Amino acid sequence: MADINDPVLAKPADLCCLKGDFHRGEPTGSIIQIEGVDTYVAKPDPKFTNGNVLLFFPDAFGLHINSKLMMDAYAACGYLTLGVDYFLGDAVTKYSASPLNDPNFDLAAWSAKHLLPSEEIAREWVKNIKAKYGNDGKVKFGCIGYCWGARIVLQQLSDGGICSAGAIAHPSFVNESHVQKSKAPVAFSVPATDKLFSNEARTRVIEICTEKQQRFNMQVFSHVGHGFASRTRLTDPYELWAKEQHFKGFIEWLDFWLARE
């Protein structure tokens, strides 16, 4: 039952979260274990590293090919990029290709199973990441979240989080309290029409961030659907352009804020 005192802004994951394409390519990163949790590590070229760490919180497909290729792309822009398997091997890719191909898969039940545990896994993972990669005090952390990862980005931009700036694409499972508690600069990249994140919800996010004078930016793309940034239909030139613009915008946002003293 919804909490009337904490209105939903981005609705729970739905079948629209399972649409889109799997991309092709050869990931260049590697999987390591951080205190028992699979972690994808994409390293920047030492000649171009900016010395900062980017935490990647994936959509329901977890550490699948699309996520790995995106993390490699962020690493190519200078960030040591780390992605967490907060589904512990039970991501949607275990049951579904694109489009959904397992008629017995119950997305609502799967989401209920993982919603709170994934938050706790992410919280402990971040603590371990900071201990491993941030102890010298010189490293700055940023974060990126797609769909499922949106609220975890907002948590990391709140008191108790470690990130100086973050970015979110086509969110799900976000309540007003997640936005209210966030403090660090945040960027959004969203479709103009999204059944999970309505125009009214977008407007409310803008109102909240404006009222509390939080630094924010919001890209809104027409004629794309939920998932356009992470499961882009590469045969659609406009959708591919929107994906590239979202990526460029996120990099410029992170570069600006993580360069600040």
UniProtKB/Swiss-Prot annotation:
It holds the Pfam family DLH. The keyword Hydrolase applies. Keywords: Hydrolase. The lineage of its organism: Eukaryota, Fungi, Dikarya, Ascomycota, Pezizomycotina. It comes from Gibberella moniliformis (strain M3125 / FGSC 7600). InterPro entries: AB_hydrolase_fold, Dienelactn_hydro. The keyword Lipid metabolism does not apply. This is Dienlactone hydrolase 1. Fusarium verticillioides possesses 2 unlinked loci, FDB1 and FDB2, necessary for detoxification of antimicrobial compounds produced by maize, including 2-benzoxazolinone (BOA). The FDB2 cluster arose as a duplication of the FDB1 cluster with rearrangement and expansion by incorporating additional genes. Pathway: Xenobiotic degradation.
